[in-house]
Amino acid sequence: MKVVRAFVGFFTSKSINEVAERIKKEVDLKIMGKWVEPQNVHMTLQFLGDITEAQAIEVIKNLQEISKKNIPFRIKYKGLGVFPDVKRPRVLWIGVSEGANKLTNLAKEVARLNAKKGIIPKNSKNFVPHVTICRIKSYDRKTLNELLRKYRTVEFGEDEVNKIALISSTLTSVGPIYTVVEEFYLGG
């Protein structure tokens, strides 16, 4: 049986991809890591890890059900943050202000329905609405702290969340390749 590495989520708008590129250029060579390619910037609602074809079919059924029960909504991107914390930053991300509760509820619904089908990722964490822009390898602490302080309250734009998708992730030496397996429009 074929296994695929996958997540449930959606791709962000071009404007957010451009913000990520601008931040990358601003801190060039002071924060080193794997920056997310503009075409790959996305919001993950649930990382599934390796799933079988049979599990993928169940996830698709769940997304179809969820899409019928939810209508499109807007989110606003605001501020930068890091995971797990500023003392050991591994991930640099753009946060969500307006619409964060709706995103959280959507992510919980995805996780709940998938769990009912026995699809429970190994590394399940509490959902924090964010868009990863860099996986940090090394950094200048002063630069990182200044960046976080500078952008703490900055609004970066907005998106309409109007669809959710099962997306496969193929890891390659040049970075992941994301492929939409199936997507559903909210309210459809």
Curated annotation (Swiss-Prot):
GO cellular component terms listed in the entry, alphabetical order: cytosol
Enzyme nomenclature, EC number: 3.1.4.58
An example molecular function term from Gene Ontology annotations: RNA 2',3'-cyclic 3'-phosphodiesterase activity
Pfam family, one: LigT_PEase
Highest taxon listed in the record's lineage: Bacteria
HXTX 1 (motif): residue ranges: 42-45
Active site positions, chain numbering: 42 (proton donor), 130 (proton acceptor)
Catalyzed reactions per annotation: a 3'-end 2',3'-cyclophospho-ribonucleotide-RNA + H2O = a 3'-end 2'-phospho-ribonucleotide-RNA + H(+)
Protein's name in the database: RNA 2',3'-cyclic phosphodiesterase
Record organism: Aquifex aeolicus (strain VF5)
Classification lineage: Bacteria, Pseudomonadati, Aquificota, Aquificia, Aquificales
